[in-house]
Each structure stands twice: as structure tokens, then as C-alpha cells.
Amino acid sequence: METIRDLVPPPHIQGIKHFVDYALVDEILRSKHFRQGSHQESQPFFGDSLLTIDHDVHFERRRLQAPLFRKEALEYYEHKELLPLISKALEECKEKRDENGVVRADLCALVRTMLARISAVTTGIDGVDTQERTDAFRNYIEQLGTGATVEWSTEDHGEVISRILQIREGFVKEFYGPSVERRVGLIKEFENGNLSEEELPRDLITLMYLHWNENWDEELPLRESTLYLVASSQTTTHAVPHLMIHLHEWFQEHPEDYEKRFDRDFLKQAGHEAIRLHLPSPALLRIALQDVTLSNDVEIKEGERVACLFTPANRDKTVFGNDARSFNPYR
């Protein structure tokens, strides 16, 4: 069943070259002759973070943060943090059974609650441990996400940036600042020989202050943390409701697959398919570092900005088949 909407290009990418074929988008994104061209207006929130840097600087930052994504770290997060946090969120739902004993919950709100707590742990934000604190934290992250994606906003961009920067001050005072202060104290204990490195928190903020680079400005860890907090929740929060709708429709058309609703491999494939069709960022912009001629003979001048549109590229029939616009968990 085709339930997919097409992308209407927003004003900030009108007037520049658009690339919608999967092969050309892939070529541009892989090319060393382009640099990041997105988030030009959202620099106060993402500037110099992993998402907006290129080449050697990007490689060094990725190497610094690599310990967060090693197998042992991911296993630690899954078993020590992720599963307990999910269980806690589900237990809180059980407390709200109706008179028939049925638990009902708003899936979007539930997923946001789970992801808020998980992103706090991996980034290094303390105190996201009650429903009240989680709601406050989640509101901050959603507001920061508005600032981080200001290019796509239909509001006055200057007003959005000003408003979200004021909101960020509250986030720093309530959550970020105390979390940094505690980690800096623990790092000093480690450097004085009173703690082992294994006793330090396993999160982004700790890594950045433990391996501080004198070329960084004081707010860089805040912007990097903003990237982690926004990105770690946005993709999943955006995809899950779509996934549920697609699965509901799929099971109606393919009742023989209903028994797979708890099959992890099937659900993983379905999740990948939902993300393919519903990426939270519909496009990335790149800037040419030199004159470039693409494989289709299109010429791009040095300094020219181009738009790689993921929505049509991920529905390219030459790559994904004639039913590319439809959900298929077996693709």
C-alpha cells in the first residue's frame, strides 16, 4: 500500500541544483571534493560539531568518540542502561491500567520518554530519572531540535534562533551545567589517582573533557551534546509511528506475517524500511571545494552549494524496484 508523501522543497534550497537520483546523491556524499553545506544558520547549536566538520578534523573527532560505539560499550549501554530504562518506562505504563486491566499509552510520548532517558545517559546528562524531570528534559531537547533545524522552519529564522538560545540557557542551568561540573570533578579525581578510568562515566561529555583540545572553544561540548541529544532521539521518534502504521497495513494485506510481530529480525528489517521512507532530514547540502564534473556530466563550480534530496533518492526505482514508494519489510 502506497502511503508516502513527496517532499516539497523548502525556500532555503530553492534556486540551487537538486539531485534526486540515488547514484548521484551517493556520489556527491562520498566525494572528497565537497564539504558540509547544511546547518549554515544553526551554527549556534551545531557549529563545529561532528555533523558540520569535514576531512581530517572530522576523522579526529570520530576517533575521539569511537569508544562510545565499540562493541563492549554498546553491550554495556544495552544491558546496563537501555533495557532497564525501557523496562522502567513500561512499568510506569502498567500503573495506568484502565478499569478493564488494559494498558493504553500514547506511543509517540512513550518513545520520546524512553529516548530522552537513553540519550541523557549516553551524552552525560544527570537527573533524568523521574517522569517530571524527564518531561522537562524532553521539552528542552525538542526546543533545541527546533533551533538545530531552523533552516527548515516556516517562522522568522532570526526570531527562532533568539528564542531557542534563551531556552538553552535554562537547559544549561538545570541539566547541562551540573552534569559537566560533576564530570570535571571526577576527571580531577582520576588525574589525582583517586579513581580508575573504568570508574569514570561512559558518555560523551566525560570523553570530551577527559581529552580536552586547546583548539576548542568553551561551548563546543555543549554544541556536540546538543547534536547527540537531538540526533539520538529524532530519527527513532520520527520513524516509530510510521513503522506502526506500515506494519498495521502490512498485516492486513499479509495476515500470514502477523505471527512475526515479535520476530526481532523481521522488526529490524521493517524498521530499516520505515527509516528509508521517512528520514527526519529530507536533504543534505554540500559545497564544492573545487570545480567538479559528476558522472552524468553535470558541472558544479567551486563554492557552489547543491542539495542532495534523500526523499526521492530513497524511492529511486532503479535501486529499490518498481514498488520503491511502498513499504516492504522484505526489500
Where does each model-flagged region fall?
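Helix-loop "lid/cap" segments that line or gate small-molecule binding pockets
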Residues: 47-52, 122-125, 244
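Conserved cytochrome P450 K-helix E-x-x-R motif and the immediately C-terminal K′/meander segment
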Residues: 1-2, 261-298, 308, 317
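Cytochrome P450 substrate-recognition site 1
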Residues: 2-73, 137-148
